[in-house]
């Protein structure tokens, strides 16, 4: 997997807690939204987030890291890591289909690892996502296709 790390910041600058309500007993929640949106703000949540940007460009802020994004950008944001994607738009502009994302409960991933030992390598990915993982190349393309 081709990924780069961003680093975390102390909780004193953590932003607002976003409460994500799963659909029923679902362990995974998929959603999409445009930009600007009330959901696009500096925030954190206990769920792991896999996030695809479909349109526009700008800056991903995750922890104390800052990284440019373009369409096709895919990032994995760890549990309770403050984050936001800021698009470069002109006043009045709207990106109707910018974001596709998936929220996963970390405990679900750990239960999966307990049930299927061959997935134990995913624990390393969970740890690395605490500083955000950004995918590039074929990894980003394949992950993006799975999200949509």
Residue ranges and their predicted role:
Residues 1-74, 81:
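Generic protein-terminus/edge-of-domain signal
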Residues 2-12, 17-26, 78-147:
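A hydrophobic/aromatic-rich effector-binding and dimerization subdomain
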């Amino acid at each position: 997997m081709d990924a780069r790390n961003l680093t975390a910041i102390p909780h004193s600058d953590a932003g607002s807690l976003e409460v994500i309500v799963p659909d029923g007993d679902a362990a995974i929640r998929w959603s999409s939204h445009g930009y600007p949106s009330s959901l696009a703000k500096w925030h954190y949540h206990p769920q792991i987030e896999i996030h695809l940007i479909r349109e526009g460009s700008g800056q991903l802020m995750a922890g104390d890291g800052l990284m440019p994004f373009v369409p096709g950008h895919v990032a994995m944001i760890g549990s309770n890591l403050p984050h936001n994607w800021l698009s470069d738009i002109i006043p009045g502009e709207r990106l109707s289909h910018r974001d596709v994302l998936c929220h996963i409960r970390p405990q679900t991933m750990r239960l999966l690892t307990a049930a299927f030992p061959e997935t134990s390598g995913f624990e390393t990915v969970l740890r690395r996502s605490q500083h955000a993982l950004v995918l590039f190349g074929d990894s980003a393309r394949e992950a993006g296709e799975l999200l949509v």
